[in-house]
Amino acid sequence: MLSINLNLIIAFLLALMGVLIYRSHLMSTLLCLEGMMLSLFILMTLLITHFHMFSMAMTPLILLVFSACEAAIGLALLVKISATHGSDHVQNLNLLQC
C-alpha cells in the first residue's frame, strides 16, 4: 500500500511540474491538470478504503465531478481561444482586450 501511495504522490508531483514547465500552451496545461486530478482521485479512493472511512465515500466522486467540469470549461476556452487567436499560446493572450 505504501508503494502505491508513493507512486501516486510522485505522479501528482510530476503533473504539477508539467503544469509549471508547459504553461505556455493551454492544451499541455489542461492535460497536466487532468493528470493531477486523476492521481488525486485514485489516492483518495485508496485512502478511504484503506482506513475504512466509508462516511467519506462520496468525496472522490465529487472530486471527479469537479474535474469533469474543469475539463469541459478548459476545452471550451481552448476552442474559443484557438478560433479567435489561431493558436493556444497563453502568452499571446490579453484577456482585458477581449
UniProtKB/Swiss-Prot annotation:
Give the source species. Answer: Sminthopsis douglasi
Keyword terms, alphabetized: Electron transport, Membrane, Mitochondrion, Mitochondrion inner membrane, NAD, Respiratory chain, Translocase, Transmembrane, Transmembrane helix, Transport, Ubiquinone
GO CC annotation terms, alphabetical: mitochondrial inner membrane; respiratory chain complex I
Instruction: Name the chain's protein.
Output: NADH-ubiquinone oxidoreductase chain 4L
InterPro entries from the UniProt entry: NADH_UbQ_OxRdtase_chain4L/K (IPR001133), NUOK/Mnh_C1-like (IPR039428)
Question: What would be an example GO MF term here?
Answer: NADH dehydrogenase (ubiquinone) activity
Q: Which cysteine residues pair off into disulfide bonds?
A: none
- Regions crossing the membrane: 1-21, 29-49, 59-79
Catalytic activity, as annotated? a ubiquinone + NADH + 5 H(+)(in) = a ubiquinol + NAD(+) + 4 H(+)(out)
What biological function has been recorded for the protein in this entry? Answer: Core subunit of the mitochondrial membrane respiratory chain NADH dehydrogenase (Complex I) which catalyzes electron transfer from NADH through the respiratory chain, using ubiquinone as an electron acceptor. Part of the enzyme membrane arm which is embedded in the lipid bilayer and involved in proton translocation.
Q: Which family does it belong to?
A: Belongs to the complex I subunit 4L family.
**Name of the encoding gene:** MT-ND4L
